[in-house]
Protein backbone atom coordinates (compact mmCIF):
# COMPACT_ATOMS: atom_id res chain seq x y z
CA UNK A 1 0.00 0.00 0.00
CA UNK A 2 1.26 3.47 -0.86
CA UNK A 3 1.92 5.82 2.00
CA UNK A 4 1.85 9.57 1.87
CA UNK A 5 4.82 11.24 3.50
CA UNK A 6 4.34 15.02 3.86
CA UNK A 7 8.10 15.60 3.97
CA UNK A 8 8.45 14.15 0.46
CA UNK A 9 5.94 16.63 -0.94
CA UNK A 10 6.98 19.71 1.02
CA UNK A 11 10.74 19.49 0.56
CA UNK A 12 11.13 17.94 -2.88
CA UNK A 13 12.11 20.44 -5.59
CA UNK A 14 9.26 20.50 -8.07
CA UNK A 15 8.99 22.74 -11.13
CA UNK A 16 6.04 21.94 -13.41
CA UNK A 17 6.26 22.37 -17.16
CA UNK A 18 3.83 25.02 -18.33
CA UNK A 19 1.71 24.95 -21.49
CA UNK A 20 2.70 28.44 -22.61
CA UNK A 21 6.45 27.76 -22.85
CA UNK A 22 7.00 25.89 -26.09
CA UNK A 23 8.46 26.39 -29.55
CA UNK A 24 7.51 24.33 -32.59
CA UNK A 25 9.87 24.10 -35.54
CA UNK A 26 8.59 23.06 -38.97
CA UNK A 27 10.61 23.84 -42.08
CA UNK A 28 9.00 26.70 -44.00
CA UNK A 29 6.70 27.80 -41.14
CA UNK A 30 8.08 30.59 -38.92
CA UNK A 31 7.99 29.45 -35.27
CA UNK A 32 6.39 32.68 -34.05
CA UNK A 33 3.24 31.98 -36.13
CA UNK A 34 2.33 28.99 -33.97
CA UNK A 35 -0.38 29.85 -31.43
CA UNK A 36 -1.41 26.42 -30.09
CA UNK A 37 -0.37 22.81 -30.63
CA UNK A 38 -1.02 19.37 -29.17
CA UNK A 39 1.73 17.15 -27.88
CA UNK A 40 1.98 13.71 -29.52
CA UNK A 41 -0.29 10.86 -28.48
CA UNK A 42 -0.38 7.20 -29.40
CA UNK A 43 -3.24 4.70 -29.40
CA UNK A 44 -2.93 0.91 -29.58
CA UNK A 45 -5.30 -1.53 -31.24
CA UNK A 46 -6.84 -4.17 -29.02
CA UNK A 47 -6.44 -7.86 -29.79
CA UNK A 48 -8.97 -10.19 -28.14
CA UNK A 49 -7.94 -13.76 -27.38
CA UNK A 50 -11.12 -15.80 -26.84
CA UNK A 51 -10.81 -19.01 -24.85
CA UNK A 52 -13.86 -20.99 -23.72
CA UNK A 53 -15.72 -18.58 -21.38
CA UNK A 54 -13.07 -15.89 -20.96
CA UNK A 55 -11.38 -13.18 -22.93
CA UNK A 56 -7.80 -12.03 -22.70
CA UNK A 57 -6.49 -8.85 -24.25
CA UNK A 58 -3.14 -7.95 -25.68
CA UNK A 59 -1.84 -4.85 -27.36
CA UNK A 60 -1.98 -4.64 -31.13
CA UNK A 61 -0.40 -2.16 -33.50
CA UNK A 62 0.25 1.36 -32.30
CA UNK A 63 -0.91 4.38 -34.26
CA UNK A 64 0.32 7.89 -33.54
CA UNK A 65 -2.65 10.25 -33.48
CA UNK A 66 -2.79 13.44 -35.59
CA UNK A 67 -2.03 16.71 -33.85
CA UNK A 68 -3.90 19.98 -34.21
CA UNK A 69 -1.94 23.20 -34.65
CA UNK A 70 -3.32 26.74 -34.78
CA UNK A 71 -1.30 29.42 -36.57
CA UNK A 72 -1.64 33.17 -36.64
CA UNK A 73 -2.04 34.47 -40.21
CA UNK A 74 -0.23 37.83 -40.41
CA UNK A 75 0.07 40.04 -43.47
CA UNK A 76 3.85 39.54 -43.71
CA UNK A 77 5.01 36.82 -43.70
CA UNK A 78 1.74 35.30 -44.80
CA UNK A 79 0.86 32.23 -42.75
CA UNK A 80 -1.50 31.11 -45.53
CA UNK A 81 1.34 31.32 -48.06
CA UNK A 82 3.66 29.27 -45.81
CA UNK A 83 1.00 26.58 -45.41
CA UNK A 84 0.14 26.51 -49.13
CA UNK A 85 3.81 26.12 -50.06
CA UNK A 86 3.92 22.99 -47.88
CA UNK A 87 0.62 21.72 -49.33
CA UNK A 88 1.84 22.28 -52.91
CA UNK A 89 4.66 19.83 -52.23
CA UNK A 90 2.02 17.09 -51.87
CA UNK A 91 -0.67 18.38 -54.24
CA UNK A 92 -0.67 21.16 -56.82
CA UNK A 93 -4.28 22.35 -57.25
CA UNK A 94 -3.80 23.99 -60.66
CA UNK A 95 -2.17 21.04 -62.42
CA UNK A 96 -3.50 18.20 -60.25
CA UNK A 97 0.04 16.88 -59.82
CA UNK A 98 0.84 15.03 -56.59
CA UNK A 99 4.30 14.89 -55.07
CA UNK A 100 6.43 12.05 -53.77
CA UNK A 101 6.28 11.60 -50.01
CA UNK A 102 9.97 12.46 -49.83
CA UNK A 103 9.03 15.98 -51.03
CA UNK A 104 6.23 16.80 -48.58
CA UNK A 105 7.06 14.80 -45.43
CA UNK A 106 9.08 16.83 -42.92
CA UNK A 107 10.41 16.40 -39.42
CA UNK A 108 8.71 18.69 -36.90
CA UNK A 109 10.28 19.48 -33.52
CA UNK A 110 8.50 20.56 -30.33
CA UNK A 111 10.59 22.06 -27.55
CA UNK A 112 9.11 22.71 -24.13
CA UNK A 113 11.01 25.39 -22.27
CA UNK A 114 11.90 25.85 -18.63
CA UNK A 115 11.45 29.11 -16.71
CA UNK A 116 14.75 30.54 -18.00
CA UNK A 117 14.25 29.49 -21.63
CA UNK A 118 16.19 26.23 -21.47
CA UNK A 119 14.86 23.22 -23.41
CA UNK A 120 13.46 20.73 -20.88
CA UNK A 121 11.59 18.42 -23.29
CA UNK A 122 12.00 17.74 -26.99
CA UNK A 123 9.73 15.75 -29.30
CA UNK A 124 10.63 15.02 -32.92
CA UNK A 125 7.73 14.04 -35.18
CA UNK A 126 9.10 12.01 -38.09
CA UNK A 127 7.49 12.04 -41.54
CA UNK A 128 5.01 14.84 -40.81
CA UNK A 129 2.62 16.11 -43.48
CA UNK A 130 -0.50 18.27 -43.57
CA UNK A 131 -3.58 16.05 -43.37
CA UNK A 132 -6.03 18.97 -43.28
CA UNK A 133 -5.82 22.76 -43.44
CA UNK A 134 -8.61 25.17 -42.51
CA UNK A 135 -7.85 28.78 -43.37
CA UNK A 136 -10.40 30.05 -40.84
CA UNK A 137 -13.47 32.20 -40.91
CA UNK A 138 -13.96 35.93 -41.35
CA UNK A 139 -16.36 38.14 -39.39
CA UNK A 140 -17.15 41.86 -39.78
CA UNK A 141 -18.13 42.01 -36.08
CA UNK A 142 -14.80 40.68 -34.78
CA UNK A 143 -11.32 42.17 -34.40
CA UNK A 144 -9.72 38.83 -33.55
CA UNK A 145 -6.58 37.93 -35.49
CA UNK A 146 -7.03 35.60 -38.47
CA UNK A 147 -5.99 32.03 -37.74
CA UNK A 148 -5.25 28.84 -39.65
CA UNK A 149 -6.00 25.39 -38.22
CA UNK A 150 -3.82 22.50 -39.33
CA UNK A 151 -4.10 18.79 -38.68
CA UNK A 152 -0.68 17.18 -38.96
CA UNK A 153 -0.23 13.44 -39.48
CA UNK A 154 3.13 11.82 -38.77
CA UNK A 155 4.70 8.37 -38.91
CA UNK A 156 6.03 8.28 -35.35
CA UNK A 157 7.32 10.49 -32.55
CA UNK A 158 10.56 10.37 -30.60
CA UNK A 159 10.87 11.87 -27.13
CA UNK A 160 14.52 12.97 -27.08
CA UNK A 161 14.50 14.10 -23.44
Language model features with spans:
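Glycine-rich, low-complexity intrinsically disordered segments
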Residues: 1-161
Amino acid sequence: MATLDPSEIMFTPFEPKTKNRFIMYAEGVPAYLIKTANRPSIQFEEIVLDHINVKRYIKGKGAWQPIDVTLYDPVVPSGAQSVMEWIRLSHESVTGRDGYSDFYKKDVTFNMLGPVGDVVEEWVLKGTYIEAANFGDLDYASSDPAEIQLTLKYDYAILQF
